[in-house]
Design a protein with these regions (language model features):
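Polysaccharide-binding surfaces and accessory modules of carbohydrate-active proteins
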Residues: 1-182
Length: 183
């Protein structure tokens, strides 16, 4: 959610194009995954613009096929001389066709970090979040959705992790059609 100088929170994003390149660039001043030489990854960038705010958003999707990993980041570029305020940016929206997953997270405290908590998805919203301005052992910005029959060696698991996080919110919502939405 972006707020313009007049207080408006309305954005009209239009598709402008895409870029496809080998490798993955490092994020400036943030820890990140990367592939400087273009041998392990391929990146798709989708470019969206708002002509009224003079805002460009670059949605970067990188696959590391050897590791079965998709990495995503978003760039917000203010092309105007006006102040824009970024109020909220969700990292992902993923819709799954059913909700037959277990929600697995790791919470804890100093000297007993990463205690495993596993619960079945249920109707409504399940979430983990933190307003501490940093990752911590209390609420780790990682979770996974696993089929109940999954073992260490086989089965279906989706893992979600912020590589760099301040405040964060991870939510899974199960609707009345028994589908799951991850945000």
């Amino acid at each position: 959610q972006v707020q313009g100088i007049n207080g408006s929170r309305i954005t009209t994003l239009k598709y402008q194009g895409f870029e496809l390149e080998k490798g993955k660039n490092r994020l400036n001043s943030l820890p990140s995954t990367f592939d400087d030489i273009g041998q392990c990854a391929e990146t798709l960038t989708i470019i969206l613009t708002d002509s009224i705010l003079d805002l460009t958003i670059r949605l970067n999707y990188t696959i590391f096929p050897e590791y079965n990993v998709l990495v995503r980041n978003t760039e917000f570029l203010n092309n105007s001389n006006n102040k824009l305020t970024l109020l909220k940016a969700m990292s992902l929206q993923l819709d799954l066709p059913d909700s037959q997953y277990d929600f697995i997270q790791f919470s804890g405290a100093w000297l007993r970090e990463r205690q495993l908590y596993r619960t079945s998805l249920r109707p409504g919203i399940q979430a983990i979040d933190s307003l501490r301005y940093s990752s911590s052992p209390q609420q780790n910005p990682f979770f996974m959705l696993s089929r109940r029959e999954t073992t260490e060696h086989s089965g279906e698991v989706y893992g979600f992790n912020f590589i760099y996080s301040g405040n964060f919110q991870n939510m899974i919502e199960v609707d009345h059609f028994d589908t799951a939405r991850v945000t």
